[in-house]
């Protein structure tokens, strides 16, 4: 009984109780004092699991309560304790992003390399959560960075999958394996390309990620970048591949031959110009060598659904991707154009040819997607177009922009399918725009170079303290005028090209009027984007022209100042002061202009955003809206033309000013020194130019304010549009409700008037009744003494009732207390009953066990009885055998006697003696055997008796039970055999 009680006590300490519930609640609330008091009580443990497998220690880690952790550690909690899923407190703290808690656990010697059931460390969970501080703390405490979980992921792969770039950078800086693979063979670079994180891709490439690695399905990083549809990542990878290819290729002639072969074998859409992709990889070469496989490969599930439901959106997205790639390619080509030597130019040609080949591949894929339904006849035309476009790009011709549209017009025959024609026209327009933009960029670069030269000349002139001769000044003035003329002519040529492009766009818009409403809307949207791009380029050109003009004016003012300095010949210090003041003024002006230009650009971007929102909010009506969009486009083109005319006027004015300046210079050359009055006049002119510059600044500010006003107006329009679109229905509802309310109010007024009339009649009646009642009351008034007596009697009754009420309240409280006591007694009785029931259940279990033991003992007794019966049978058999043996002995004796009698007569004495001895020996042996059998039988009977007694007493050994069971089975087998 004592051992049973001890067992019950041990089980009670491990069971969940109220203190454990309170401990969980205190940890949930972060009450460290209550946690300390509860842990001091018996039975409460911080690592005890509840029904869900939670513990108070792990809950504190999930909540990040550091004070509770300190209290638990002082009470001797096991820091390495795990919950039902194998998570330690360190894992849970990292999972929930609590760096302070992690730091404390590591200080209390919690192992940083501990692993849960999934093979993950705390660093895996910190990387998945994206907590940079937690990752830093774990790395400082030497948590394994390249340890893989059951899925084959290291913390770097987990951070990339969850899109935490900062954690990725930190892990890479602390020695994470860049080329580590998961179970599917995917590297960190592949996962970063799939998630579309350009920063992480760049960091991985810098850390030496291998771009040629392939996963278990044979896909490389480029494939995953195409899945994410991120053009920036694709261009990054392609540029890296091209760099690696350039480093690896020993000779450039072989590469040139390979590219020329590929470009001759290739067929596809018209090629986009000056694309930066790298030389083709061996996988792409295999794809190119089998064009049938490219065209016959089916699209994936997502792509087929996309093209089936929204083909127009797919076309527009592909065109936009091409534009992005073209913009990237122009930047790459501009950077490549800086090469000067012949060897570098040859390298540049090889690179450009490789990039052209890769672009044709990409364009072919896009065209196959867009023209899946178009007839096969268009493929030959498109291949001819791509071949022609590649040749025109690679041929060194001076007039590229003029040759391209004619070649496209010759090489592109009319196709029956409308989608094919629209895409081809768009490609042609985009090519023309890109060419014109490229030429504009070149010219702007040349103008900037000229400006730099002018600035250098000015600086050299400033450094010279000696006075300049009039001849040198005139030469500088003539050089400036020539340069200004050159820049003006270049600018006019660029503007003419822009105008021609705009006219071509107009013609393209007019030619597409016969198409369907949806195609019109798509074309108008595309041209909208092109016009916006042109607008931006025009504005840049305008701003640069204004800057050029301002620079020219500055140069003129500086020249005038130098001439004045020559006339007056002031000291070098005064010159330097003047120079510094003018430089500071010019710098301030430039800063203000740059600031205003930035604000102007921001305002324009906001206007574009508002226009886009307005377009998205306006209802789309196919034919009417296309006409409206065309009108707006025409207006925008007219505005652009106006701006161009204004620019040309500005340049003419600048030219006129230059001519005036030349005339003045020629007059000044006549005389060696400038007169004081003339000097004052020149000062006046410089002040005028300054005022003009300030006026231009004010104009810029006014333009900026106008743009801001336009912005506010557009915002108001958007708000008004939103309010009207939402509140028209509400307004109608309000009007209807107001009308109904007015009708109801009118009806109520009528009813109220009627009610008033009735009430006035009732008031008159009541006044009459009041007068009558007053008269009756005056007749039936009670005297004051009787009234006071009644009041006293009523007060006494009220007091008595109040006393009774108090007594009843007291009785009620007593009854409540008795009820509470009864309830407590009932609850105690219930608890006792539950305890008794548990004891009863335990006793019943013991009784059932004893009954089972009793049944087993009865079965064993029955078996022993059977064994005793068999033993009695064996004894009887033995008795029978003994009797038979005695009979045989008697027979032998008789035979001996007979033989002894015969021996005297027949044989000699020797033989008789020998036979007698033999027989005697046999008899002795038989007697010995009989004695041994009796002994064995007695021993067996005694053993059986002992075992029967033990079985009756319930003290039989297990070995004996096993032997008895074996005997019973043997007896059963013998009976079955019989």
Swiss-Prot record:
GO molecular function, one term: actin binding
Region ranges (Disordered): 248-299, 388-424
Keywords annotated in UniProt: Acetylation, ANK repeat, Cell junction, Coiled coil, Cytoplasm, Cytoskeleton, Differentiation, Nucleus, Phosphoprotein, Repeat, Spermatogenesis
Amino acid composition bias (Polar residues), ranges on this chain: 282-299
Keyword Secreted tagged: no
Coiled-coil stretches noted in the UniProt entry, renumbered to this chain: 349-374, 427-945
SMART domains with a match to the protein in the record: ANK (SM00248)
Keyword Phosphoprotein: yes
Complexes and interactors: Interacts with PALLD. Associates with actin. However, does not bind F-actin directly.
Main function: Plays a role in actin regulation at the ectoplasmic specialization, a type of cell junction specific to testis. Important for establishment of sperm polarity and normal spermatid adhesion. May also promote integrity of Sertoli cell tight junctions at the blood-testis barrier.
Record-given protein name: Ankycorbin
């Amino acid at each position: 009984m004592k051992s049973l009680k001890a067992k019950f006590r041990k089980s009670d300490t491990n069971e969940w109780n109220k203190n454990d519930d309170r401990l969980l609640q205190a940890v949930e609330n972060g009450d460290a004092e209550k946690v300390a008091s509860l842990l001091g009580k018996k039975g409460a443990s911080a690592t005890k699991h509840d029904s869900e497998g939670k513990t108070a220690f792990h809950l504190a880690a999930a909540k990040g309560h550091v004070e509770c952790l300190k209290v638990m550690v002082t009470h001797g909690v096991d820091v390495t304790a795990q919950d039902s899923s194998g998570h330690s407190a360190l894992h849970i703290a990292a999972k929930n992003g609590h760096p302070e808690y992690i730091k404390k656990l590591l200080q209390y010697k919690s192992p940083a390399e501990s692993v849960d059931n999934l093979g993950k460390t705390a660093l895996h969970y910190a990387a998945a959560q994206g907590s940079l501080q937690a990752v830093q703390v774990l790395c400082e405490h030497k948590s394994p960075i390249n340890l893989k979980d059951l899925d084959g992921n290291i913390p770097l792969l987990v951070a990339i999958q969850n899109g935490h770039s900062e954690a990725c950078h930190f892990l890479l800086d602390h020695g994470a394996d860049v080329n580590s693979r998961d179970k599917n063979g995917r590297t960190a670079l592949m996962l970063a390309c799939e998630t579309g994180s350009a920063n992480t891709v760049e960091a991985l490439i810098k850390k030496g990620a291998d771009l040629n690695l392939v996963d278990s399905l044979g896909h490389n990083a480029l494939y995953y970048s195409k899945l994410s549809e991120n053009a920036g990542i694709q261009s990054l990878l392609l540029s890296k591949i091209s760099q690696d290819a350039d480093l690896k290729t020993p000779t450039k002639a072989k590469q040139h031959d390979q590219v020329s072969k590929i470009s001759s074998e290739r067929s596809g859409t018209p090629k986009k110009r000056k694309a930066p992709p790298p030389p083709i990889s061996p996988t792409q070469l295999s794809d190119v060598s089998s064009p049938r496989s490219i065209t016959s490969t089916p699209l994936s599930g997502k792509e087929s659904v996309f093209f089936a439901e929204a083909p127009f959106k797919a076309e527009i997205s592909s065109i936009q991707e091409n534009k992005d790639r073209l913009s990237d390619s122009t930047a790459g080509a501009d950077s490549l154009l800086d090469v000067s030597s012949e060897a570098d130019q040859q390298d540049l040609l090889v690179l450009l040819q490789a990039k052209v080949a890769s672009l044709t591949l990409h364009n072919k894929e896009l065209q196959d997607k867009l023209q899946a339904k178009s007839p096969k006849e268009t493929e030959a035309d498109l291949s001819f177009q791509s071949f022609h476009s590649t040749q025109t790009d690679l041929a060194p011709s001076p007039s590229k922009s003029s040759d391209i549209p004619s070649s496209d017009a010759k090489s592109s025959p009319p196709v029956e399918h409308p989608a094919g024609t629209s895409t081809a026209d768009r490609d042609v327009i985009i090519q023309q725009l890109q060419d014109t933009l490229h030429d504009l960029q070149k010219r702007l670069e040349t103008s900037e170079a000229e400006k730099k030269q002018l600035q250098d000349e000015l600086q050299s002139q400033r450094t010279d303290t000696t006075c300049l001769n009039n001849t040198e000044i005139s030469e500088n003035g003539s050089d400036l005028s020539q340069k200004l003329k050159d820049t003006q002519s270049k600018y006019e040529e660029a503007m003419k090209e822009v105008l021609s492009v705009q006219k071509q766009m107009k013609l393209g818009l007019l030619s597409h009027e016969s198409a369907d409403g949806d195609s019109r809307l798509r074309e108008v949207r595309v041209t909208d984007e092109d016009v916006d791009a042109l607008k931006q380029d025009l504005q840049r050109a305008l701003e640069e022209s204004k800057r050029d003009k301002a620079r020219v004016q500055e140069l003129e003012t500086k020249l005038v100042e130098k001439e004045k300095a020559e006339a007056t010949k002031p000291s070098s210090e005064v010159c330097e002061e003047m120079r510094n003041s003018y430089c500071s003024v010019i710098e301030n002006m430039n800063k203000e202009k740059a600031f205003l230009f930035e604000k102007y650009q921001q305002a324009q971007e906001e206007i574009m955003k508002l226009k886009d929102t307005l377009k998205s909010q306006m209802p789309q009506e196919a034919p009417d809206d296309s006409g409206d969009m065309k009108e707006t486009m025409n207006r925008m083109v007219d505005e652009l033309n106006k701006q161009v005319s204004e620019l040309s006027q500005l340049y003419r004015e600048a030219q006129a000013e230059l001519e005036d300046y030349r005339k003045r210079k020629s007059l000044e050359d006549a005389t060696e020194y400038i007169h004081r009055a003339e000097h004052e006049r020149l000062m006046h002119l410089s002040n005028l130019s300054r005022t003009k510059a300030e006026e231009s600044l004010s104009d810029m500010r006014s333009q900026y304010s106008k743009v801001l006003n336009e912005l506010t107006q557009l915002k108001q329009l958007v708000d008004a549009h939103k309010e009207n679109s939402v509140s028209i229905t509400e307004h109608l509802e309000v009007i209807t409700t107001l009308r109904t309310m007015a009708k109801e109010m009118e009806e109520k007024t009528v009813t109220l008037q009627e009610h008033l009339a009735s009430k006035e009649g009732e008031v008159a009646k009541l006044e009459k009744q009041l007068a009558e009642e007053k008269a009756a009351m005056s007749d039936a008034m009670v005297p004051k003494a009787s009234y006071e007596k009644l009041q006293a009697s009523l007060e006494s009754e009220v007091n008595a009732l109040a006393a009774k009420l108090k007594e009843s309240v007291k009785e009620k409280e007593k009854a409540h207390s008795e009820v509470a006591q009864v309830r407590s007694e009932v609850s105690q009785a219930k608890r006792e009953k539950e305890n008794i029931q548990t004891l009863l259940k335990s006793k019943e279990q013991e009784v059932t066990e004893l009954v089972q033991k009793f049944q087993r003992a009865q079965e064993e007794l029955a078996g022993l009885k059977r064994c005793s019966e068999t033993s009695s049978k064996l004894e009887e058999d033995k008795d029978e055998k003994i009797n038979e043996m005695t009979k045989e002995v008697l027979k032998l004796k008789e035979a001996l006697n007979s033989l002894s009698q015969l021996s005297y007569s027949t044989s000699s004495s020797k033989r008789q003696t020998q036979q007698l001895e033999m027989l005697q020996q046999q008899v002795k042996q038989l007697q010995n055997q009989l004695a041994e059998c009796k002994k064995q039988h007695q021993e067996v009977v005694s053993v059986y008796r002992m075992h029967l007694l033990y079985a009756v007493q319930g003290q039989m050994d297990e070995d004996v039970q096993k032997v008895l069971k074996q005997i019973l089975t043997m007896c059963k087998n013998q009976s079955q055999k019989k």
